[in-house]
């Protein structure tokens, strides 16, 4: 009895609930031993088991997590992509948390047999004037920069937001894109018994132990640094090349990154997906410390490690490649026909665990009775405040200086965004990053987007807006949207209000993806983004990829020549009753509430096809989606980044200038093409409004009886973040 109580106490300490421990005992028909209890603590964690999200994720895609990443076919190639988070580790150890987040997502792409070609990130922080937040911000950017630059994968784009709700819970979401031969994609599924499990990469140490469990609970403020992994980008670079070579060997059957829960998760899931069991020999696993405990070996999340399944006789070829790249190699076990997960000290030694593999990998599925948050009702009922500042000059300058809208140059200038020479535009020059597919005329466009104000005020419509915003960003460079990857960042799933937000966000994602014919092919869920009793705003992050058929026809947001005519396309008349969630209200009025604007799916798709057609015809010289900060902010950014002035003919209210209604683009055309453009728009039933014409930089921006000196605006826009960091 004493032993049983001890095991149960260990289980509770490891995060297994009483009900879950009883369920394990019931399924096994016995009490697990201590070692097995450690295995369950990781595999049944939220991070590995998706306990609170599986019910909803099945509605998106039945094979949502079948492989390491999703892909689309473009130009005869498989373009592989996925986004993941490293939120908790980055809150505790910003530099290593962010760096190893890069390493992990790169290995997910690598495990598909794809060469990583680009990184993007979605970063959320609190107020950077807070010293603690500033430390996290600088550490995260440095970690991303050092790791990404060292492995030779460019960071080509992303977004960074600042909101006090993320002060103790920063969000570090990273997207990676890779390219592979469409006929040679690797699988993570074992394909039968009597195959060898081969370990490749760094040695196993104590870093990252309990990382999966750590990511499955609220941040407490305690020292959780032992749960944070430590990265080595130079080993990762060698691992990338070694993996791509190993996957060319005929006898290599499957590949899996050793991520969350390390050896345990990679081996058990590979075997389970293939309908077989496996047998592991711990003495064979390369170790940094000889005194490392068996359970530590299994749960360690030491970085830069991969698992391969190979035919017997193939291992020598794999070993030769590992020797070439100076990384560790070991045969650590084999697949077996019996569907059990067996762990031994060595091939002849003591059995430490013997578990039915389906019980180990299939955590329970929870479906809560959700509750509509009281804030949801209250926020919708809020009346917009009377405008305190009516001076357009002051409003625009305040918005351009706000860290959510100002240039992120301080961040991206630390990234090597041109390495491998695939990148067409430097960051911020276009609404999406564009990557050339070498030896073809095609390119891919990639973007990553979110809007926590929208998704807080209305998780369903807000998530739809984010998906459509991502699509607009691709349209703005001439790319047809193809597919989605997502990272769903939420608070405590045991809170019925958070669970409601999650469900509604999923429903919005599903509806928008169907409307745009952009399937969700991969993704991730990050729960427990809460500190004590405060959860973050619901923050679904959407990565989207699109195809550009002719790289010669791409456009960006920069105005080109003086005399070109500028138009607003789409919703030309703003609904002043639906400007809730706008940065104008948040920044100028300190107000978060009211109704957000909804997308019109049919019109939006028609509008997007219209823009793509005009880009293809060469009529549009620049395209810029109107989003954060509204119309005048978007117009000013195009002027700033192109070093061009603007003479406007617009007479508009503050709400029209700074509201954020959906489905709008700013475009420019040659003066000689303006009549043709207007005629095509009229015949296509597309709303357009002439805004003015492009002038020289010396002319500044003249609009709505206000004049802006371009040099002053450039200084405000480019220097805001750097001044805050350096203070």
From Swiss-Prot:
EC category: ligase
Keywords from the UniProt entry: ATP-binding, Cytoplasm, Ligase, Magnesium, Metal-binding, Nucleotide-binding, Purine biosynthesis
Record: residues binding Mg(2+) 1: 84, 524
Gene Ontology cellular component annotations, sorted alphabetically: cytoplasm
Residues at which ATP binds: 50, 82, 486, 523
Domain of life from the UniProt record: Bacteria
EC number: 6.3.5.3
GO biological process, alphabetically ordered: 'de novo' IMP biosynthetic process
Binding positions for Mg(2+) 2 per the UniProt entry: 108, 257
CDD domains: PurL_repeat1, PurL_repeat2
Subcellular location, record wording: Cytoplasm
Keyword Nucleotide-binding listed: yes
Record flagged with keyword Ligase: yes
Pathways per UniProt: Purine metabolism; IMP biosynthesis via de novo pathway; 5-amino-1-(5-phospho-D-ribosyl)imidazole from N(2)-formyl-N(1)-(5-phospho-D-ribosyl)glycinamide: step 1/2
Subunit structure as annotated in this protein's UniProt entry: Monomer. Part of the FGAM synthase complex composed of 1 PurL, 1 PurQ and 2 PurS subunits.
Family: Belongs to the FGAMS family.
Role description: Part of the phosphoribosylformylglycinamidine synthase complex involved in the purines biosynthetic pathway. Catalyzes the ATP-dependent conversion of formylglycinamide ribonucleotide (FGAR) and glutamine to yield formylglycinamidine ribonucleotide (FGAM) and glutamate. The FGAM synthase complex is composed of three subunits. PurQ produces an ammonia molecule by converting glutamine to glutamate. PurL transfers the ammonia molecule to FGAR to form FGAM in an ATP-dependent manner.
Protein name: Phosphoribosylformylglycinamidine synthase subunit PurL
Native source species: Petrotoga mobilis (strain DSM 10674 / SJ95)
Gene: purL
């Amino acid at each position: 009895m004493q032993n049983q109580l001890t095991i149960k106490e260990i289980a509770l300490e490891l995060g297994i609930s009483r009900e879950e421990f009883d369920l394990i005992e019931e399924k096994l028909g016995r009490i697990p031993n201590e070692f097995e209890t450690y295995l369950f603590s990781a595999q049944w964690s939220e991070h590995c088991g998706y306990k609170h999200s599986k019910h909803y994720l099945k509605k998106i895609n039945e094979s949502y997590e079948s492989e390491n990443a999703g892909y689309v076919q473009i130009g005869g190639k498989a373009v592989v992509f996925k986004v993941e988070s490293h939120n908790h580790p980055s809150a505790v150890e910003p530099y290593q948390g962010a760096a190893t987040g890069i390493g992990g997502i790169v290995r997910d792409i690598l495990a598909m047999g794809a060469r990583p070609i680009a990184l993007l990130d979605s970063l959320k922080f609190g107020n950077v004037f807070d010293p603690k937040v500033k430390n996290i911000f600088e550490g995260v950017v440095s970690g991303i920069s050092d790791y990404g630059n060292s492995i030779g994968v460019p960071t080509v784009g992303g977004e960074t937001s600042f909101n006090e709700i993320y002060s103790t819970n920063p969000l570090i979401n990273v997207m990676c894109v890779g390219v592979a031969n469409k006929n040679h994609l690797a699988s993570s599924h074992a394909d039968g018994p009597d195959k060898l499990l081969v370990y490749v990469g760094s040695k196993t140490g104590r870093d990252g132990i309990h990382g999966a469990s750590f990511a499955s609970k609220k941040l407490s403020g305690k020292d959780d640094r032992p749960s944070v992994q430590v990265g080595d980008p130079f080993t990762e670079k060698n691992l990338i090349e070694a993996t791509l070579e190993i996957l060319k060997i005929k006898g290599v059957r499957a590949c899996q990154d050793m991520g969350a829960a390390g050896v345990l998760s990679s081996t058990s899931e590979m075997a389970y997906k293939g309908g077989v069991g496996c047998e592991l020999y711990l003495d064979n696993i390369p170790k940094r410390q000889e005194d490392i405990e068996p359970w530590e070996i299994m749960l360690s999340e030491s970085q830069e490690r991969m698992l391969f399944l190979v035919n017997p006789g193939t291992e020598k070829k794999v070993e030769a490649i590992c020797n070439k790249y100076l990384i560790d190699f070991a045969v650590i076990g084999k697949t077996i026909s019996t569907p059990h997960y067996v762990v031994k000290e060595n091939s002849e030694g003591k059995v430490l665990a013997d578990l039915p593999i389906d019980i180990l990998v299939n955590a329970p599925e929870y479906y809560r009775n959700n509750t509509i948050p009281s804030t949801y009702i209250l926020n919708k009922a809020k009346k917009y405040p009377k405008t305190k500042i009516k001076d357009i000059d002051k409003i625009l300058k305040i918005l351009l200086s706000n860290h959510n809208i100002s240039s992120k140059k301080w961040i991206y200038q630390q990234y090597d965004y041109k390495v491998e020479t695939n990148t067409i535009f430097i960051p911020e020059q276009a609404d999406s990053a564009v990557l050339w597919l070498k030896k073809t005329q095609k390119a891919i466009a990639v973007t990553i987007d979110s809007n926590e104000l929208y998704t807080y005020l209305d998780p369903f419509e807000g998530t739809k807006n984010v998906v459509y915003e991502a699509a607009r960003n691709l349209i703005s460079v001439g790319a047809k949207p193809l597919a989605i990857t997502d990272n769903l960042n939420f608070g405590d799933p045991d809170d019925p209000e958070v669970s409601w937000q999650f469900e509604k966000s999923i429903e919005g994602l599903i509806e928008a993806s169907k409307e745009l014919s952009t399937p969700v092919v991969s993704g991730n869920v990050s729960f427990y983004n809460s500190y004590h009793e405060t959860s973050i705003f619901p923050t679904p992050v959407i990565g989207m990829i699109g195809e550009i058929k002719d790289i010669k026809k791409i456009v960006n947001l920069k105005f080109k020549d003086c005399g070109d005519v500028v138009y607003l396309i789409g919703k030309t008349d703003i609904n002043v009753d639906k400007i809730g969630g706008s940065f104008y209200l948040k920044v100028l009025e300190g107000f978060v509430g009211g109704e957000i604007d909804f997308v019109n799916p049919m019109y939006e798709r028609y509008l997007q096809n219209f823009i793509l057609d005009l880009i293809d015809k060469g009529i549009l010289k620049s395209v810029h989606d109107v989003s954060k900060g509204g119309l005048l902010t978007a117009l000013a950014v195009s002027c700033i980044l192109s070093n061009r002035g603007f003479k406007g003919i617009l007479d508009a209210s503050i709400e029209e200038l700074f509201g954020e209604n959906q489905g709008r683009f700013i475009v420019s055309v040659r003066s000689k093409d303006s009549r043709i453009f207007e005629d095509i728009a009229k015949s296509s039933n597309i709303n357009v409004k002439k805004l003015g014409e492009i002038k020289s930089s010396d002319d500044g921006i003249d609009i709505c009886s206000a004049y802006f000196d371009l040099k002053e605006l450039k200084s405000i826009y480019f220097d805001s973040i750097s001044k805050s960091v350096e203070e």
